[in-house]
Amino acid sequence: MQDRPWDRDKDYDTLVKWWTDWEFGMVPKECLPPDGIVVEVDGKPICAGGLYVGEGTQFGFMEWIVTDKNAEQRTAHKCLKICIDSIMKLATDKKLKLVYTATKEQALHKRYTKYHNMVLTESNV
């Protein structure tokens, strides 16, 4: 398993396929953050996520966390851990003091608190 920076141009078709498979809405390429991570296994992308950074601030917003719906569940789980940890490292490297994220997916809520030491500050919003 290997993480790498995402390339909005080259990775966009993969992201669109994953969003479509999961029946998520589609995000225009120009609206994706320039900073993001893709995790691959043997050169095959398994998951990805992005990090918006507020210009002139030390605030980040982690968004668009998504996996290949056809990936084996354990592999996707391990890749997600790498992806989110890599996004948080990217935030640290950029000297961000706060990274916020929002999701209605309970599995991600649990993942963020259990595996990534994130604090749930709001729910049902």
Language model regions located:
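Short secondary-structure junctions
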Residues: 3-4, 24-27, 117-123
